[in-house]
């Protein structure tokens, strides 16, 4: 479980708090989407959770461990993050080297490392690219490698920070399917930082940020149907929902099957 209490963060030379007295909790094993406009504080929170930023004040607790300078390494072993631009995460000369990097730091035997690399590269559909240089991959392929590298370390919490924002529709769909697969087959706590409701719609529930504050929480459908919150957080409605809104006699829905059922009645 992740507990955040009275969290404040202010960037140097800024007169406003990026996170302003934020209190929330995220249950273990749930998929949570954090929504909000640019500058709402959602990505700042993700960087605090992985120990990259130190809070101005307040408390962060992950799995019973309070985040501080002494516990930072332990917390970082529990939390993995995939960034918006995976190029910022690549270390190895090849896909294989990149997935292996964190495993080598765990002092695992080479046979075990090879086994883990094979398993997770196949899981994300990148096994045939193991000898490829990361910079020669497409955006979607790079994100898959970044996800494999994090999964290989077996963290308890995985944060996806705007992972689809730079991808084309095909790449975006591919990554969302992969996240859905991780959600269904693993007991991980997943946190998706996004402003895209297409990404958030498959979460168990959503947290909505605006100006560094938590302004709403609830199931994706409830958030989507709250026009005030949608406008405040500048949330972009899913494509299916936009279509259903324009069809006369159709109840707005984000579910494609439900929309087809209504049309065919």
UniProtKB/Swiss-Prot annotation:
Q: What is its main location?
A: membrane
Q: Does the keyword Signal apply?
A: no
**One Pfam family matching this protein:** ABC_tran
List the SMART domains: AAA
| Enzyme type, top EC level | translocase
Membrane topology, record value: Peripheral membrane protein
List, for all copies, the residue spans of the domain called ABC transporter. 2-236
Q: Which key words tag this protein in UniProt? A: ATP-binding, Cell membrane, Membrane, Nucleotide-binding, Translocase, Transport
Q: Which InterPro entries match?
A: AAA+_ATPase, ABC_transporter-like_ATP-bd, ABC_transporter-like_CS, ABC_transpr_CbiO/EcfA_su, ECF_ABC_transporter_ATP-bd, EcfA_1, P-loop_NTPase
EC number(s) from the headed UniProt entry: 7.-.-.-
Give TM segment ranges: none
The reply on keyword Nucleotide-binding is yes
State its location(s): Cell membrane
- Superkingdom field: Bacteria
GO cellular component, as recorded? ATP-binding cassette (ABC) transporter complex
Q: Which SUPFAM superfamilies match?
A: P-loop containing nucleoside triphosphate hydrolases
> What are the protein's GO molecular function terms?
ATP binding; ATP hydrolysis activity; ATPase-coupled transmembrane transporter activity
Q: How does it assemble?
A: Forms a stable energy-coupling factor (ECF) transporter complex composed of 2 membrane-embedded substrate-binding proteins (S component), 2 ATP-binding proteins (A component) and 2 transmembrane proteins (T component).
* Function field: ATP-binding (A) component of a common energy-coupling factor (ECF) ABC-transporter complex. Unlike classic ABC transporters this ECF transporter provides the energy necessary to transport a number of different substrates.
UniProt record similarity statement: Belongs to the ABC transporter superfamily. Energy-coupling factor EcfA family.
Name of protein: Energy-coupling factor transporter ATP-binding protein EcfA1
What phylogenetic lineage does the species belong to? Answer: Bacteria, Bacillati, Mycoplasmatota, Mycoplasmoidales, Metamycoplasmataceae
Q: Which gene encodes it?
A: ecfA1
């Amino acid at each position: 479980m992740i507990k955040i209490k009275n969290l404040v963060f202010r960037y140097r030379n800024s007169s406003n708090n990026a996170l302003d007295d934020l209190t929330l909790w995220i249950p273990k094993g749930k998929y949570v989407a954090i929504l909000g406009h640019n500058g709402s504080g959602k990505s700042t929170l993700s960087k605090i959770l992985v120990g990259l930023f130190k809070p101005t004040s307040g408390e962060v607790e992950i799995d019973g461990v309070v985040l501080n300078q002494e516990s930072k390494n332990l917390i970082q072993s529990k939390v993995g993050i995939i960034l918006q631009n995976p190029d910022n995460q690549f270390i190895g000369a090849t896909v294989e080297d990149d997935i292996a990097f964190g495993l080598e730091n765990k002092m695992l035997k080479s046979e075990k490392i090879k086994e883990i690399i094979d398993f997770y590269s196949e899981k994300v559909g990148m096994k045939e690219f193991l000898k490829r240089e990361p910079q020669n991959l497409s955006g979607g392929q790079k994100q898959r490698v970044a996800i494999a590298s994090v999964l290989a370390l077996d963290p308890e919490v995985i944060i996806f920070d705007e992972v689809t924002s730079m991808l084309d529709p095909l790449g975006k769909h591919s990554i969302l399917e992969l996240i859905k697969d991780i959600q269904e087959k693993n007991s991980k706590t997943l946190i998706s930082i996004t402003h895209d409701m297409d990404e958030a719609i498959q979460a168990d529930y959503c947290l909505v940020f605006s100006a560094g504050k938590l302004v709403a929480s609830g199931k994706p459908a409830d958030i989507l149907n709250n026009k005030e919150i949608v406008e405040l957080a500048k949330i972009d409605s899913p494509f299916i929902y936009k279509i259903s809104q324009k069809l006369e006699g159709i109840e707005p829905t984000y579910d494609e099957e439900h929309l087809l059922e209504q049309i065919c009645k």
